[in-house]
Amino acid sequence: MVAAMKHYIITLDTGTTNTRACLWTIAGEYLGMEKAAAGVRDTAIDGSNHRLKQAVRTCLQSLVENAGLSFQEIGGIFASGMITSNVGLLEVPHLTAPASADDFARQIYPAELPDVCPVPIYFIRGVKNALAEGAALKDMDIMRGEEVETLALLQEYPAGAPYVFILPGSHGKFVFVDDGQAITGCLTTLTGELLEIITTHTILADAVERSFVTSQTYCRQAVLEGFHAAQEQGFGRALFSIRIQKMFSQGQRASSQWAANYLLGVVLENDISALKNNHLCKDLGQTVGIVAGKEPFLSGLTDVLTEAGLLHTVQKYSSQHPAPLSARGAFLIAKCFWEGRE
């Protein structure tokens, strides 16, 4: 086994604006992380991945040197996320769902990029939905990065039940997993970006004082009222009602914090509608929902999903593990990869 001659591996994750490199022992001990404020947005803006390459190179060098190591001791770098896209380091085609951890390991794309580092980089493919002949494009979706997060989460949940992992962010992801723990597809929304734009660049910016809900200001009642308003009145009308409440209500309901929570509920209704009308999982009532992410989406999505009653159960995920989910999932695939080469 190649890894047996080395003592460490690195997992590398690049997103829109940031890159993270994590150091691990071959046995799975997490040793630390280095970050770089560079991502695929830089490539999109520059028309070249030169800046991204430089940032990744510096990040990897710092990680290795700060640990008192050399690249000769690194068995490989396992890269996931948008780094495998056309605005990353190297574009690698998606896997087609369904896909298990072993499938990702078997389909790893190895590459030598000496202008980035002297160690082979093993690119972990993203996933695209399977599209049956004659099916509409509305059933197609893609992800790069959330698949490794999902594989990490699956280590903490038993096989034998179907899951949907809800991973909020700028782009919200619903990742569907069958009872054999294979990823069967995903569903993407723009909820995070919508919330940011409405909060800062619409007439409602005044009502919410251009502020987002935090874990300290979260109000379940206001979120659910906004959620139900969007269900009953439609998205646009529910949004404008925030301004009406601000102008004509008194007390708590006239506060910017109430308005921000109400707005969160209105926007999250889009996610629930998308889930309800999805074509990947027809038996939502038997599916376990796991919400993993940061506040206020963690509480907001848990509450509106529970209120909607679409899923068998809805659970919040929390962990004290110091490594990010993406790194833990990439390490799992690395382990499968090395074991498959024995």
What is each PLM-predicted segment?
Residues 41-48, 128-229:
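Glycine-rich phosphate-binding loop plus the immediately following alpha-helix
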Residues 9-13, 74-78, 163-167, 289:
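Short glycine-aspartate micro-motif
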Residues 66-140:
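Short beta-strand-loop/turn "lid" adjacent to the catalytic site in phosphate-handling enzymes
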Residues 300-303, 316-342:
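Glycine-rich phosphate-binding/hydrolytic loop that grips phosphoryl groups
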Residues 18, 283-304:
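Glycine-rich phosphate-binding loops at beta-strand->alpha-helix junctions
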Residues 9-51:
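Short glycine-rich, Thr/Ser-proximal phosphate-binding strand/loop in the N-terminal lobe
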Residues 227-274:
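Adenine-nucleotide phosphate-binding core of ATP-dependent small-molecule kinases
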Residues 58-76, 272-284:
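Phosphate/pyrophosphate-binding loops at sites that engage ATP/ADP/AMP, CoA/4′-phosphopantetheine
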